[in-house]
Amino acid sequence: MPKQSFALFLLFSVLWMSCMQARDNDTVVTIGTFNMEWLGDGDSLDVKKRTEQDYKNIALVIEQTGADVLGIEEIENDAAIRRVLRYLPGYSFQLGSHGRAQNVGVLYKSTVSVRAGFEYMPVATRGDRNRPGYVVECSKGNFAWTMMVVHLKSTSRADSTPELRVASYANRREQVQALRWWMDSVSAISGKNAIITGDFNDFVQRAQNPTLTELINSSSVVFLTKELRSCRVPTWYGIDHVVANTAAASRWLSEGVQVIPIERLLPKEQAEMVSDHCPVVTVFSTK
């Protein structure tokens, strides 16, 4: 690592750890999302093959988020996330099983109470071609919330024709409609806090073929992360989001929303083995 880059890395680490220590108290809770890009269990069939050092680096990145609760995406199975948890004492997890090799779930510290969750199948609007959501009930201090973790349909290189791309947009819109129904049903309970976090595979500002419209147009939904930029391509808006209903958003501390830049924590070649996404976190008051 060049001397200048190493100096910047050290400066970032010191400042970030100071920020995390300030958050590590009972008056706030840090909630986020992290797509770990094909996190496998280490066998020969893994799509993205990682070394033990790579699993350690993933744990380092998670630790640096300071998250009390982290939505996690693209996890092959329980064994895969346990490879990371070896290096994260004090964390527990819950994981779905109907996302094939890309399951979603939640990672959380002992600082938070998290009840046993369940997969929310209505988000998988096209059966096993989609991933269901994962819902948990959480609380810390005087803040209790219902949270869903999602990984919506992507529009990728595999969608190689105009027809396939149009179909992917339609599929994601269906999923967003299911999220709107869920958010509305939770919000109908007076004072109930609801949060959706995960990889939405789209950004709020999209003008052509937008797919998040059903949530954006809701007067009871706030995209807390809509102004964040991609850590990989800074000119792009991010697709990893934390979304809250108005009750939960009233607890939001806007200065705490940020992307955790992996390439400032690790050399580039190591950062690339962690994920093609960076964690996104937000902070809420628990008072």
Tell me the role of every PLM-derived stretch.
Residues 143, 149-168:
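Active-site His/acidic residue clusters
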Residues 19-88, 92, 98-101, 176-180, ...:
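N-terminal, active-site-proximal structural segment of metallo-dependent hydrolase catalytic domains
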Residues 7-16:
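Bacterial N-terminal signal peptides
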Residues 43-49, 66-72, 94, 123-125, ...:
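Second-shell loop/turn segments in exported
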